[in-house]
């Protein structure tokens, strides 16, 4: 599948709940996701919901944006829990 053919549902770590979050954020395509900041998406989602969202959601956003930007991303980095480990170490997450 070419990078242009990928859909949001094709990204690793993206399930039905995340697809709903993308819709809430106005993201409908991988191309739109590629131009977004995972940190900003997380902040916007917290604001839209009016509550603090589990930070694992941020990890999924980072994994999804990284895949959108790099279709050849290493398999391990496509998993949300890879980014969860990075975040918990205090390292800067990709944006």
Regions found by a protein language model. Give the residues of each.
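C-terminal extensions
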Residues: 1-12, 16-95
């Amino acid at each position: 599948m070419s990078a242009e053919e990928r859909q949001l549902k094709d990204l690793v770590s993206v399930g039905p709940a995340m697809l709903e979050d993308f819709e809430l954020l106005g993201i409908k395509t991988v191309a739109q996701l590629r131009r977004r900041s995972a940190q900003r998406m997380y902040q916007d989602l917290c604001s839209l919901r009016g509550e603090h969202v589990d930070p694992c959601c941020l990890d999924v956003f980072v994994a999804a944006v990284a895949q959108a930007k790099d279709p050849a991303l290493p398999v391990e980095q496509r998993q949300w829990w890879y980014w969860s480990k990075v975040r918990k170490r205090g390292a800067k997450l990709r944006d």
